[in-house]
Amino acid sequence: MGVLEDLVARAGGCAVIDGGFATQLEALGADINDPLWSAACLITRPHLVKEVHMQYLEAGADVIISSSYQATIPGFIARGMSVAEAEDLLRTSVKLANEARDEFWKSTLRKSKPIYNRALVAASIGSYGAYLADGSEYSGSYGADITAEKLKDFHRRRLQVLASAGPDLIAFEAIPNQMEAQALVELLEEEKVQIPSWICFSSVDGKNLCSGESFADCLKILNASEKVAVVGVNCTPPQFIEGIICEFRKQTKKAIAVYPNSGEVWDGRAKRWLPVECLGHKSFDALAKRWQEAGASLIGGCCRTTPSTIRAVSKILKGRTGH
């Protein structure tokens, strides 16, 4: 049994992934109005990155994801750093998550009745579109001159550095098109990565990837890879998730991970976020229970979800009365 299967079994059949990172960094006073997004805090306020990991562990997360989604070597170089400094920051993202997990686990073991699992650390790798920060991560349109080979070249060194930093998992997140999924599968084979990986897509309509390509075609690519342990979706509206899980169940035997956005909608007039309940939707944790029943093995949150969200999800999925 691999580390991921073992964790899911220890969690009672469904493990909890952490939630939104940027929102929580802002809540702690970080300014992330930066092309590097939450990865900017690796440079300026690493202690806050570790604090967010701690908050999610306390909330019951079984998997915490490094703050490297938008951390790329070209992105750091554009900030005036050397290649060596950029690679050090990538390693730091995993180091901070590992330190938080180890410290939290040590404190948990001192308690007479531990109610937590020893969490796994996933090294986050965002899409090429996330690096471009031009909206293409939401459309999947990278332009005619981008090929699978170019995408492999873009991701290769970051994957090598993050994999060498000691994570338990590699998490490719919010992948918006089939070409990038194919490139990542080939890259995992070429680099002989021995760490289990997951590849999660993003969707705006609940039926296809952001690019409009079908889940079925992309899952065929992932199904053929032994390096990909988990498939799923993240950064997607929560109301689509149950249907996506049902569709994935027909197309794959791999474990399924889902960690959608909160479902809040920005009210441009009032300049505030409207809570999900205003839209007539069920609360996030109530939906999470349905996702578990539909067949998801890992459940968490993405944009605008918080430790409170994950605490509620952990309680409802694991049947706990309190943390």
From Swiss-Prot:
Co-factor requirement: Zn(2+)
Domain Hcy-binding residue range list: 3-317
Reaction catalysis annotation: S-methyl-L-methionine + L-homocysteine = 2 L-methionine + H(+)
Protein keywords: Amino-acid biosynthesis, Metal-binding, Methionine biosynthesis, Methyltransferase, S-adenosyl-L-methionine, Transferase, Zinc
Membrane spanning residue stretches: none
BP terms from Gene Ontology: methionine biosynthetic process; methylation
NCBIfam families documented for this protein: PRK09485.1
Protein name: Homocysteine S-methyltransferase 1
